[in-house]
């Protein structure tokens, strides 16, 4: 089942963001470092290109992502003309504090009290936009929470006389083109609970972990490498249920509860540092999709294309 979630408040948030875009200087596009392309909202790109606003791509939650893969993503993005990217974690306030300077480089004309730099934070739900704003402000002004759609309206605050920052509600888009993107977004808690089926999302996640991070699965759930080598995604969840004593009446494994355990463990980062996609897996997915009968011709990972004002960039892939 294709995952889609575009509740009414997102449509009004999109219209409001389009309006605000006229009165800001730089977009801080927050992506999830564990799934940078799947968490890239085409609406954000469309809105900022309409107004020709420069953009800093920030791969947030880098503390949860595989550092080697994050490094590959940063190199990948920074190779593209007009794209500036860095990775960070809101858990490291020192890294976040560098953002105004990096944004300033993208809009060098906005650099005094008369023309303060106006930054707009945009991104998918639950990616850490409000947390980022609170860290920059060094105050808990915006409400945050580990669920999608916590912020429902825009809020602009003055960082100091030279900088203002606007937090926006998380935005998805009306049609997520690739099923695996919907599943990655759902696994990472960017999709409303009613728009997904935990068991389906957890089965996708288990399959991905089995292929890419079997050692992390083995150590978290006390399964041997041999056991894992012989099972599929569904049986991984079954085994988690049995290891954790999650049973229904009659002794049958409680698949639903075990699915929730796996999803929560991934979201909390207790499995270890995991990236759901790499530049190479992204390209392979797009090639597969394009080869399907009637399949869309995929754009390669990243946006490519336009020249934007040059900025100094830093590559803090570790994010811890
Ligand atoms: N591990 C980790 N967690 C983070 C980071 N940044 C934010 N979070 C957590 O992510 C969750 C969502 O944060 P919010 O700031 O509410 O996210 P948001 O993008 O404003 O979400 P919406 O308002 O729903 O669109 C919270 O539980 C934060 O503590 C980070 O860099 N690392
Ligand atoms: Mg928020």
Regions found by a protein language model. Name each.
Residues 63-122:
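Canonical P-loop GTPase G-domain recognition
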Residues 29, 57-59, 121:
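Structural beta-sheet core signal
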Residues 1-27, 34-35, 40-55, 62, ...:
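Helix-rich effector regions associated with P-loop NTPase G domains
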Residues 119-138, 142, 168:
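Glycine-rich phosphate-binding P-loop
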Residues 116, 139, 154:
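Short coil/loop residues immediately preceding or within conserved phosphate-binding loops
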Residues 103-110, 125, 136-140, 148, ...:
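Short, well-ordered alpha-helical segments in soluble proteins
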Residues 98, 102, 131, 204, ...:
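Alpha-helical scaffold segments in soluble metabolic enzymes
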């Amino acid at each position: 089942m294709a995952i889609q979630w575009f509740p009414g408040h997102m449509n009004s948030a999109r219209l409001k963001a389009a309006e605000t875009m006229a009165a800001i200087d730089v977009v801080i596009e927050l992506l999830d470092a564990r799934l940078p392309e799947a968490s890239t909202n085409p609406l954000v790109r469309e809105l900022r290109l309409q107004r020709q606003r420069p953009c800093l791509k920030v791969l947030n939650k880098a503390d949860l992502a595989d550092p080697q893969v994050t490094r590959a993503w940063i190199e990948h993005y920074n190779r593209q003309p007009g794209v500036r990217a860095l990775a960070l974690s809101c858990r490291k306030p020192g890294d976040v504090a560098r953002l105004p300077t990096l944004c300033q480089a993208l809009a060098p004309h906005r650099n005094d009290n008369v023309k303060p730099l106006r930054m707009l934070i945009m991104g998918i739900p639950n990616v850490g936009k409000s947390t980022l704003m609170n860290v920059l402000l060094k105050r808990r002004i915006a409400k945050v929470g580990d669920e999608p759609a916590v912020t429902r309206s825009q809020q602009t605050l003055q960082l100091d006389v030279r900088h203002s920052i606007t937090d926006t509600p998380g935005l998805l888009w009306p049609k997520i083109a690739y099923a695996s993107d919907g599943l990655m977004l759902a696994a990472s808690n960017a999709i409303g609970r009613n728009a997904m089926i935990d068991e389906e999302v957890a089965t996708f996640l288990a399959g991905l972990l089995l292929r890419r991070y079997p050692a992390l699965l083995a150590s978290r759930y006390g399964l041997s490498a041999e056991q894992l080598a012989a099972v599929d995604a569904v049986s991984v969840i079954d085994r988690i249920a049995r290891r954790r004593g999650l049973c229904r009446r009659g002794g049958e494994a409680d698949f639903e509860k075990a699915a929730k355990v796996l999803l929560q463990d991934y979201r909390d980062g207790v499995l270890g540092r995991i990236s759901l996609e790499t530049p190479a897996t992204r390209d392979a997915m797009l090639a597969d999709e394009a080869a399907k009968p009637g399949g869309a011709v995929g754009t390669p990972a990243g946006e490519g294309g336009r020249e934007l004002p040059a900025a100094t960039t830093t590559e803090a892939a570790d994010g811890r």
